[in-house]
A protein has these predicted regions:
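Rossmann-like dinucleotide-binding domain that binds NAD(P)(H)
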Residues: 1-62, 138
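Mobile, glycine-enriched helix-loop/loop "lid" segments at the mouths of ligand-binding/catalytic clefts
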Residues: 4, 77, 82-100
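Hydrophobic alpha-helical segments typical of transmembrane helices
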Residues: 8, 65, 93, 119-123
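Short acidic/polar mixed-charge low-complexity motifs
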Residues: 8, 46-48, 72-75, 131, ...
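C-terminal helix-rich "cap/oligomerization" subdomain common to oxidoreductases
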Residues: 45, 88, 122-167
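Glycine-rich Rossmann NAD(P)(H)-binding loop
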Residues: 53-57, 70-72, 163
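Short glycine/proline- and acidic residue-enriched helix-loop micro-motifs
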Residues: 101-108
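Active-site loop of classical SDR/Rossmann-like NAD(P)-dependent oxidoreductases
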Residues: 108-120
Length: 167
């Protein structure tokens, strides 16, 4: 979120639960604490707001993954597993969509409709010195802090400042 928005998060609010997945599992007598559904809202320094709508048991729906970005000029949506990219522009009030082809070998090589494959390729090129590093350790640190803050917001039912997790 923060890399796409180009700003840092300042606060998060969330509602989440463990309602379907892993409930029948037990490790050392404890049920896993994996949240399998959530709504998470981040507010950013530049005034932007981002929402994560997570449901890890929505496989039998038309679009089991929907990624959206909304701005002053319109909206773009990425719909999986159909691999549709749809753009709606306020300038002409038209929706334009296209289906992005992903080779079967790539889908079979990783998860997330081929994204895992491309991430692994980029990482390998960076390790070999053939390309710049796309994400840094600092990006990873901030991503983990965002996850920790979101978990706190959900489990404590409150707004969490990113300062509380060291950002």
């Amino acid at each position: 979120m923060r890399r796409i928005i180009g700003s840092e998060p300042v606060r998060v609010m969330a509602s989440a639960g463990r309602d379907v997945n892993h409930l029948d599992e037990s490790y050392n007598g404890d049920v896993p604490d994996i949240l399998d559904n959530a709504y998470v809202i981040f507010d950013f320094e530049n005034g932007a707001r981002a929402l994560l709508d997570l449901c890890m048991f929505a496989e039998a729906t038309r679009h089991n993954e929907e990624l959206c970005a909304i701005g002053e000029t319109g909206k773009v949506e990425c719909l999986l597993p159909q691999n549709i990219v749809a753009r709606g522009a306020r300038s002409d009030w038209q929706m334009h969509s296209e289906t992005v082809h992903v080779e079967k070998e790539i889908l079979d090589a990783g998860h997330h409709s081929g994204a895992t494959y491309y991430q692994n390729q980029a990482f390998l090129k960076a390790v070999r010195g053939e390309a710049d590093v796309i994400v840094s350790a600092e990006d990873g640190h901030r991503a983990v802090a965002m996850g920790v803050a979101a978990q706190m917001a959900a489990t404590e039912a409150r707004i969490v400042s990113m300062q509380e997790v060291g950002l």
